[in-house]
Curated annotation (Swiss-Prot):
Associated disorder: Molybdenum cofactor deficiency B: An autosomal recessive metabolic disorder characterized by neonatal onset of intractable seizures, opisthotonus, and facial dysmorphism associated with hypouricemia and elevated urinary sulfite levels. Affected individuals show severe neurologic damage and often die in early childhood.
1-thioglycine PTM positions: 88
InterPro entries to which the protein is assigned, alphabetical: Beta-grasp_dom_sf, MOCS2A, MOCS2A_euk, Mopterin_synth/thiamin_S_b, ThiS/MoaD-like
Similarity comment text for this entry: Belongs to the MoaD family. MOCS2A subfamily.
Organism: Homo sapiens (Human)
GO cellular component: cytosol; molybdopterin synthase complex
UniProt keyword annotations, A-Z: Cytoplasm, Disease variant, Molybdenum cofactor biosynthesis, Nucleotide-binding, Phosphoprotein
Lineage: Eukaryota, Metazoa, Chordata, Craniata, Vertebrata
Descriptive protein name: Molybdopterin synthase sulfur carrier subunit
Entry comment on modification after translation: C-terminal thiocarboxylation occurs in 2 steps, it is first acyl-adenylated (-COAMP) via the hesA/moeB/thiF part of MOCS3, then thiocarboxylated (-COSH) via the rhodanese domain of MOCS3.
PTM annotation (Glycyl adenylate): residues: 88
Domain of life of the source: Eukaryota
Gene responsible for this protein: MOCS2
């Protein structure tokens, strides 16, 4: 069994509006695919499904595609959910 670790999820702009928080700590498997990590977050905040195809997902300040990429997380890692920023 893969051990769990606690990571901090940071929400920006529209994702913060949807979740109602700017950050939270969650417990997830230390080894997890990027898409599965997103699904864990989406389960907590179903409204994020509306922006899933628009967000930028970053782990330890590195962009990650929501796919089968295996992530090896460490306790305290930061996961950022960044929707597109509009403006002019």
């Amino acid at each position: 069994m893969v051990p769990l670790c606690q990571v901090e999820v940071l929400y920006f702009a529209k994702s913060a509006e949807i979740t109602g928080v700017r950050s939270e700590t969650i417990s997830v498997p230390q080894e997890i695919k990027a898409l599965q990590l997103w699904k864990e977050i989406e389960t907590r905040h179903p409204g994020l499904a509306d922006v899933r195809n628009q967000i930028i997902f970053a782990v330890r300040q590195e962009y990650v595609e929501l796919g089968d990429q295996l992530l090896v997380l460490q306790p305290g890692d930061e996961i950022a959910v960044i929707p597109p920023i509009s403006g002019g």
